[in-house]
């Protein structure tokens, strides 16, 4: 598993064999996502829909240029930008295996970070179910010191089912 974070920089060789698939989300935006990540997402999405929760991908793969644009936008308007967005070259989104979710709630799609933070009950269910499809919550609540980022309930990382279950079991052992 490739780790990209504030200490581990991305390079193009990391994705030379990655197959990105095209997907049009609820806004008809073109999203690119790594093939296995997308397949797992579609299964998670279908399972959650049965439980009354509708999710979609707000953001997937990001080029260095796209990440730079997002980073500069945060830099201009948020004093805590370094705890909310990765610098270009240090984002898991460069791998295509991380997705940011939008959630349909009370008749509308929610994608703003502030509003998503208030969706406590839907995210409890999403976080419980995602493990079974190979996703982990990369920036959990209470782990800001370790991750270097604020809690981001919408940011999922696909690691495969074996690894997601091992991570879940390891967390449970340490409680």
What is the role of each PLM region?
Residues 1-175:
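Extracytoplasmic cell-surface/polysaccharide-interacting catalytic and binding patches
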